[in-house]
Amino acid sequence: SFSTASQIVSIRDKIECVNGLAGQFECNEIDLMSFMDKTEIGGSNSTSLNDIWGWTDPQTNKEYALVGMSNGTSFVDISNPENPIYLGRLPTQTNNSTWRDLKVYQNHVFIVSEASGHGMQVFDLTQLRNISSPTTFSNTAYYSGFGNAHNIFINEDTGFAYAVGTSTCGGGLHIVDISTPSIPSKSACVSDPNTGRNGTGYSHDVQCVVYNGPDSDYVGKEICFGSNETNVWIADLNTKSEDSSGAKTIGLGSYDNYYTHQGWLTEDHKYFIVNDELDENSNAYNNTRTLIWNVEDLSNPVIETTYLGPTPSIDHNNYIIGDKVYMSHYTSGLRVLDISNISSPTESAFFDVYPSNNNTSFDGTWSNYPYYPSGVIAVTGIDEGLFVVNPKGNVQGEAPTVTYEVPTEGSVTLAWELIGDSTTRMNIYRDIEEGFSPGSSNFLASVDYPGIEFTDSNLDSSIFYYYKLAIETNGQLGPYSTEIKVKPIVAPNQAPTIDVPADVE
């Protein structure tokens, strides 16, 4: 049972974390911006929340929470984190289910569930732009290549989705080509029968990246890091071909496992930080155990260190930005782990969404999404609702104002004003598609403070280029600039153009 739901009322307006409390919630260095009860976001008293992901509209810079629920997926505009707005929901494809998982690619969300026959729903998020009242939406596309699935991961750099825990592929990787989001198509099944409780290669969760770590044999290849119930599984998925023998396996990490649940890579691809969901519940460890794997040699992953948290709560999902790990620990809430000293990690902040207790039980928070440019974090409370929180010291910056000119044929010079220090830089993204989403695939360059301009050269003067810029401070990315459209051709008497935010007169 979930004892806190009836005790929490909806909250608008910021409640600061002062002396270890934000209202009734225990906290440290994280403020509460708002809370929406599950009945406000498309649920009933019997509905439960599960996974969460986010989307930032590349045209408007608005931020949205995509909230997994037992009865479907809800969409909430959190652009004003102190006054979130419920926009509507996409109902479950078949039946209700405790388990739902979702990720975003090219302005579409891809949704799977353990509901029987559910398949993968695809929804075009740009439909959220002009909603004036809560709406019940329909699929944009649908993939029926599997029924139920436990989780989904999307490699945005390659355009492949990885559904795991399905009734196909031994429960391993069911790979779907989503390079055209509205036309998903099966690519391959990959598993390793040396992993998983039933010897079929069942993967509970996975993260796949274009590898850029220290193991030179695999740089530039698509490498997957699976949490396969009994092992950490590392596999070369650069070639998408069928394999159920384990032939694609590079390395296996073995340890005193109870349930290898989920993990996330550090940004330098040197470490894989894993949660084991059942070790606390099995009374194997008194407090929450987080395993930090050294994966510098992909063929030989080894545990670098083990972190034991301050409570006995169960750990669930980890996500990483810079030297911080954002962890959902069921009854003890969102925990932030500082890994700047990887051999001796320390907790730097927390926000407990479940005030009743910190027991070893499956109550409290399921997951969190820390990747909004504004720096706010969306957190699900399983039986409570949606929390939006904000780490102290995170000041929601303004989008930069950028000027540009074409100094010579085939080149564009971008310029800006920047106030900062040695931790500040301007990140520049470029694409040839209008309305693009900034990310690693279209990242162009960074200019460290005090630099205030950048020239992009060797361009095709016959086409348009699109640019977005964002200020990064202490590893935290601020809002993106208005999209700049320019053709690098010199026009007679051409004057620089200034892009001014719409609210500036």
Predicted features along the sequence, with ranges:
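Ser/Thr- and Asn-enriched, surface-exposed coil loops between beta-strands
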Residues: 406-413, 448-453, 505
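Extracellular interdomain linkers/hinges and stalk-like, low-complexity segments
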Residues: 489-505
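Pro/Thr/Ser/Gly-rich low-complexity, intrinsically disordered linker/stalk tracts
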Residues: 394-423, 461, 476-493
